[in-house]
Amino acid sequence: MAELNINERQAGDVTVLDMAGKITIGEGSVALRTAIRRLLEEGRKKILLNLAGVGYIDSSGIGELVSSYTAIGKENGQLKLLNLTQKLQDLLAITKLLTVFDVYESEAEALNSYK
């Protein structure tokens, strides 16, 4: 089983990636990078990462989140985060990245924010 499982679904013009597992150096961060790059190549620029199932993220995973955010921003797209675990929220607060990302607890609220 891969470190990170990603299920993709559409909610209107927003692509939601439901993620479960770990975003770590190696398979996890590569899986995220590959998914984001593919979506951008397909012209899908409104992306919501549902991180409810992500139990662990290391510095490589954090780096990949930032890299994804930057890549999507360069394409005039938007990357937003949904359902952060307390551990991940604390990590983003410590690294001052909580102020960079738009973070939501409600999927409906997150989806409405793209309009």
Language-model features and meaning:
Residues 1-18:
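Short beta-strand/loop segment at the start of cytosolic alpha/beta domains
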Residues 20, 107:
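Residues at the C-termini of beta-strands that transition into short coil/loop
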Residues 23-101:
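Amphipathic alpha-helical interaction surfaces in cytosolic regulatory modules
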Residues 86, 108-109:
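Acidic phosphotransfer microenvironment of two-component signaling modules
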Residues 102-106:
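Short acidic-hydrophobic, aromatic-tinged amphipathic segments that line or gate anion-handling sites
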Residues 111-115:
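Short hydrophobic/aromatic patches at helix-to-coil boundaries
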